C-alpha cells in the first residue's frame, strides 16, 4: 500500500483531520455495538470513517508503523492548524487513507495494537466499504447526517426480535415495558407500537392484569403464559376483555354475600358492640331492645328489596280490627297496621314470651288481637333461630316489673323509598336539660303517622340498631338523618307511662326527678287546687322563670313555674311555688301558648300588682310517698 500522503505528517491539514476524527471518537466509542446493525453500504462506510477511534485508537496510524497511542501522547508538541471547516480535496484524501487503513489490518496481525471486538467489526465493515467506494462525497455526508435517524428503527427492530429468544430476560423487560405501554395508551401512541407490546405486558406486569388476579381470578394467569403470538393480533383488545371479566367475577361474591350473611347472624356480635356499653350505663331493657333492633336491621339489609317489600302486605289479614286489651299500644298498633299495611308494622317486645322456636306458633292461645300476632310473627321471622332462642331465654329470666315495661316497648319497621324521612323529629339529649331523647313531633303525612305506632312524646331507644341512650342532641339527629338512606328503618320506642316516668305536668329539674315516685303517687290520689294570687310586677319581671309550653323540648306541656328568683317579692310572700301551673295572667289565658309568647305577655304588663290564677297539686297524701318533695 502507498502511504506517501501520510509521510507528510507535519502538514497541518492532515493533523486537522486527526483532530476532527478525535472529536467524533467520544460519540462512536460509547456504542461499539451499533456498527453491525447497519446493513446499508453508505452507513457502514461512515462508520469506517468515524469508527477507528471507537475503542481502537492504535490502528488508526498503522501506516506509519507506530501506534496511535504514543503519537496521541506527543500530540501536544505538534503544530496544529486552526479548527476550520474541511475542504473537499483533503477530505477525499483522508477518506482514501481511512479505506486503506481499514482493509490493511486484516493482513497485519499485531497483538499489541489490536483488540478482540475490533476484528469482528472490521470484518463486517470491509465488504461494505469496498462496495461503496464509488459513492460521492455528498452521498457520504448525507448518509452521515442521517446516521442517528436511520439507526433508531433498526436498533428497535433488533431489540424486539431478541426479546422472544430469551425467556428470563423477557419477563422483567415485559414488566418495564408494561408501564410504558399503559402510558402510551393514555397518551394515544402510534398504532404500530401498541400491538407489539401488549402480548408481553398484559400477562405479566400491567396494572390491569395485577388487579384482575386479586379477588378470585386465579384462572387468568395460566392463559397469560401462553405463547405471545396468539395474543399479538388482538392489539389493545385484551384490555377491554379483561375489564368485563374482572367485573363479572368481582360481582359474583357480592351477590352471594347476602345469602351467606342472612343465614348466620350471631347475636353476640351485636352484644359485643352495644350491650357492653349498655350493661354499664343502662338496664337489661335497653340491651334487649337494642339486640332486637340490630338483629332485625341486619336481617332486613341482607334480604333483597323485592322480598323485604313483599312481606309487608302479608302482615295484616283481612283487615282484622283489634279488640280491647290492657295495653293501649296494642290497640293502636292493630288499627295502624290495618290502615297502613304498606308502610310498616311493629312488634311489642312482650310478645316474645308467646313464641317458640317454630317462629310461627304461639305458646298460649290468646283470643286477643290477631293483627298484632301477624305483625309479631313477621318480625320474629326476620330473626334467625339462634337469635330468637337467646332473646326468649333473656326474656324468660326477667322479673314481672321488667316484663310490664316490655309492654310499652315497640319495635317499628318502616318501609320507605331511599332518601325519604321517617316522619318525626327528635327532642332532648345528654347535653340538654331533658336527657331523654323523645319524639318531638310526628308529621301528619309522614311514614310514622301512617304506621301509627310512634307517637309524640315517646322515648326513642334506638334507630336502625344504633342506641340513642346517653347521646347528645346532635348525635341523635345525625343517626336520624342516616336512616334516610336504606329502604327499611327499624325504630325502637317506649311509651312513657305513669309507671316509667314522672308526671308530664311536673318539673324536670333535679329535685323533681329525684322524687319521681312521689309525684306519681300524688298525681294518682290527690286533686289539684286552683288558687288566685296577686304578684308584684317590677322592672325585672314577676320574679320567676317558666318552663314547658307548646312545642317545648318535652312536648306540648302546660306552662309551669321553674324556679323563683332570690330577693323577689314572690319569694318573700311565698304565694307561688315551683311546679305551679299558670292558668291565667292578668286576665289572659295561658293555655296553648309557647314559652316565648308567655314571656312577651309578661313583659307587656305594666308595673304593679298582677292577678294570677295558678293550679297547684295537693300534697295531702305525702305519707304514702316513697320520698318527699324538698
Curated annotation (Swiss-Prot):
Biased composition (Low complexity): 129-143
PROSITE patterns: PDZ
An individual GO BP term: leukocyte chemotaxis
A Pfam family that the UniProt record links to this protein: PDZ
Phosphoserine: modified positions: 220
UniProt keyword Transcription, yes or no: yes
Keywords assigned by UniProt, alphabetized: Chemotaxis, Cytokine, Cytoplasm, Nucleus, Phosphoprotein, Repeat, Secreted, Transcription, Transcription regulation
Record region (Interaction with PPP1R12A, PPP1R12B and PPP1R12C): 404-500
Keyword Repressor: no
InterPro entries in the record: IL-16, IL-16-like, PDZ, PDZ_sf
Comp. bias regions, Polar residues: 321-343
GO cellular component: cytoplasm; extracellular space; nucleus
Region Disordered, residue ranges: 30-268, 316-343
Residue intervals of the PDZ domain: 410-495, 532-617
GO MF, one annotated term: CD4 receptor binding
Function: Interleukin-16 stimulates a migratory response in CD4+ lymphocytes, monocytes, and eosinophils. Primes CD4+ T-cells for IL-2 and IL-15 responsiveness. Also induces T-lymphocyte expression of interleukin 2 receptor. Ligand for CD4. Pro-interleukin-16 is involved in cell cycle progression in T-cells. Appears to be involved in transcriptional regulation of SKP2 and is probably part of a transcriptional repression complex on the core promoter of the SKP2 gene. May act as a scaffold for GABPB1 (the DNA-binding subunit the GABP transcription factor complex) and HDAC3 thus maintaining transcriptional repression and blocking cell cycle progression in resting T-cells.
Binding partners and assembly: Homotetramer. Pro-interleukin-16 interacts (via PDZ 2 domain) with PPP1R12A, PPP1R12B and PPP1R12C. Pro-interleukin-16 interacts with GRIN2A. Pro-interleukin-16 interacts with GABPB1. Pro-interleukin-16 interacts (via PDZ 3 domain) with HDAC3.
PANTHER family linked: PRO-INTERLEUKIN-16
Protein name, as recorded: Pro-interleukin-16
Protein's organism: Macaca fascicularis
Protein's gene: IL16
